[in-house]
Amino acid sequence: MKRLLLIDGNSLFHRAYHALPPLTDRSGEMANAVFGFSNMLIKAIGEIKPTYIVCAFDTRAPTFRHIEFEKYKATRVTPPPDLYPQLPKVKKVLDAFGIVYFEKEGYEADDILATLAKKFQISNFKFQIVILSGDRDVLQLVDGDVKVQMPGWNLKETTLYGAKEVKEKYGLEPHQMVDYKSLTGDPSDNVPGITGIGPKTASQLLQQFHTLENLFDHVKETPLKVREKLEVGKDIALAAKRLMELDRSVDLKFEIGNLKFSPDWEKVRREYEGLGFKSIVAKLPQSVHSSQLTACLPARQVHRKKKTVNREPKTNNSDQLKLV
């Protein structure tokens, strides 16, 4: 079966920056986000062995969610000045791998991933789809053909979410995650939920009533204290759902055949040699005829005051991705 890897570029970019200490490339510019992003990308390629890869990024332009709710993501702090100057280098790495990436004003990377997953699911081919993201919003996309691989904050470990894993953690089916977050809110995006309705209560309500709309249709069947909270917060929750639900109909122009993953490893090697990431170069296939990547996390290279410190983490083989 063909395997598609969908990458949440912004999520991985931010996670890499905050997970790793300061690191400069050969030119002396900050590159810890580039290094960490590359770690996660190479690890995923080695484990999943995708037939196709696509990456998606946010743009700096407002989205339809900002228009709907002016305070959307308003509480997020100003990004560090050395973060976004690294983004062009991440995209250059993707270019070296031959990986296509999409970005579209008015939409977030998650919307693009949702659209791509849908388009591949309804194509003439059968795909196993893995979404690589640290954003739990994409859990709503999980179904029989779609799984989410979520890297840990240390970048070493990953958690694979299928429908079973989502239910074990939240007590809900993946498609209920939108309604769940509509009830609880999402502080990271500054989206309010219903005051007094926490994760446990939200999960219990959706286990009983299945959808947000059905819950409000049968609100009189809930305990009095819960009912009062639901009645007061109904409009808030319904508005939150419009923000939480990913758009699966973004207008994207592409041909599936152009997204096939077939890298020129010599080009990839030259890109990382140019950056001075020696430990990553060591993980690449040794010849253009080999496709074997070392899936473990490469060594950290931290350049401070012209000194290089290499710390090789212990290899953990227990988190190898299993696709069934």
What are the residue ranges of the model-derived segments?
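RNA/tRNA-interacting regions in translation and RNA-turnover enzymes
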Residues: 49, 98, 300, 319-324
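Short Gly/Ser/Thr- and charged-rich N-terminal loops/segments
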Residues: 293-305, 316-317
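Extended two-metal-dependent nuclease catalytic cores across DNA- and RNA-processing enzymes
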Residues: 23-24, 74-249
